[in-house]
Amino acid sequence: MAALTRNPQFQKLQQWHREHGSELNLRHLFDTDKERFNHFSLTLNTNHGHILLDYSKNLVTEEVMHMLLDLAKSRGVEAARESMFNGEKINSTEDRAVLHVALRNRSNTPIVVDGKDVMPEVNKVLDKMKAFCQRVRSGDWKGYTGKTITDVINIGIGGSDLGPLMVTEALKPYSSGGPRVWFVSNIDGTHIAKTLACLNPESSLFIIASKTFTTQETITNAETAKDWFLLSAKDPSTVAKHFVALSTNTAKVKEFGIDPQNMFEFWDWVGGRYSLWSAIGLSIALHVGFDNFEQLLSGAHWMDQHFRTTPLEKNAPVLLAMLGIWYINCFGCETQAVLPYDQYLHRFAAYFQQGDMESNGKYITKSGARVDHQTGPIVWGEPGTNGQHAFYQLIHQGTKMIPCDFLIPVQTQHPIRKGLHHKILLANFLAQTEALMKGKSTEEARKELQAAGKSPEDLMKLLPHKVFEGNRPTNSIVFTKLTPFILGALIAMYEHKIFVQGVVWDINSFDQWGVELGKQLAKKIEPELDGSSPVTSHDSSTNGLINFIKQQREAKIQ
């Protein structure tokens, strides 16, 4: 594929931006088109609630949207989409298919990889997960002293941690009757020490999530958990009642002491950051029940069908993706804020921080050339209204344009005080996107200060600080209620957005070579930390850091 910057549609878009971009004014766009909301919004109607995507508060016109969609077509988004759904090996650097969509393919239509339909294997693992969940949640599965399981501890990192953690937090209202869940990811001993201190080995079940069963952080934490467990249980044969594996390495799993019958497999066409739909989601299913896990899959499958079959101009993931391209590649925006106004979604931004930045944080194209344009943004965010009292100042009056996605459910899980809390939350959600769009003019600020009785001197002093330029772009994503189905749909929507942007940039969104170099160097440095002899084999900075650590290791602190 030709470089993006040589694409005629992209050049046309850039030319338009150079000539007209600075003239785009959201207040003016709304004033001159009273139907702007209807022209630039999309409602997705499902049998399990509705999702409204309002993108009218973006710096776009109908002409710009046409150019963005023409660009998507010219970059082969539709063909690439079919290649993914058809099981072609679109992960070119690892020669793998990319089929998280198969994991939630509720229609069971065949999906073929290397001449073999993968759906029977997918369904076999789902059936095994279902039976296991029923045994644990019903109390049929007993620990070594005959106690039922009260706590499930997922030990994994990256995609084996972030997805299940985010979803179990988001679906906490649906966890009645399930065990508590804990997540240990960090190699920092504090993480597992703090977790184990809260647990009873007799009623704890550990899920070790590692495809290869060799991931350093995960296996180190798993061995620590096993040692802690055996301090009480004594008998190594009891490990089989308290440890299960999500892996493909039967030999290593067996060597650890886990019964291979309690190993849940997944496949090389499941990328870590897209794996919560697979056996990696076992902690989700245990916590909220398998029926709710299936609803999560169904919501994602609904969005898969929307993404695959809907024309681009009405396609939610495509619209989100191309708006992102507009801001990143024409306006020079470097970050994207994800701001869920729902406390249960407090890990949503962190989840897509990995999903987006590990997927599209690349400067090499599929053909091996270096890009001459920006690619993936820095993704960040916190739940509303907390963020309003932290970083919204910079979004409103800072020098950087930060496109924002605001998300909120219409119905709350907790209508306390007759819904007062949620009404205040909704009001803040609505106010923020309006404020970012409209801002506050000099004249409006002046009238406000005059009404407050400010003297002419104070007025002139405060006036420039009270002005808001506005014209800050936002998407509003409003959904009926945060249910397993709707959550599945929202996650899939963002997954496909990331995919579309990767296609436009001609990068492989499904490898992650950038995480390897640090791991390689860490293996070299680890033995150098032993002993007290100074290290001289690195650059002066790394040598200095290692030697300071060695000096301070035994330092006495008062």
Curated annotation (Swiss-Prot):
PTM sites of type N6-succinyllysine: K454
N-acetylalanine found at: A2
Positions carrying Phosphoserine: S107, S185, S455
Keyword Lipoprotein: no
InterPro entries: G6P_Isomerase, G6P_Isomerase_C, Phosphoglucose_isomerase_CS, SIS_dom_sf, SIS_PGI_1, SIS_PGI_2
Residue sites binding D-glucose 6-phosphate per the record: G159, S160, S210, K211, T212, F213, T214, T215, Q354, E358, H389, K519
Record note on quaternary structure: Homodimer in the catalytically active form, monomer in the secreted form.
Protein name: Glucose-6-phosphate isomerase
Source organism: Oryctolagus cuniculus
Taxonomy of the source species: Eukaryota, Metazoa, Chordata, Craniata, Vertebrata
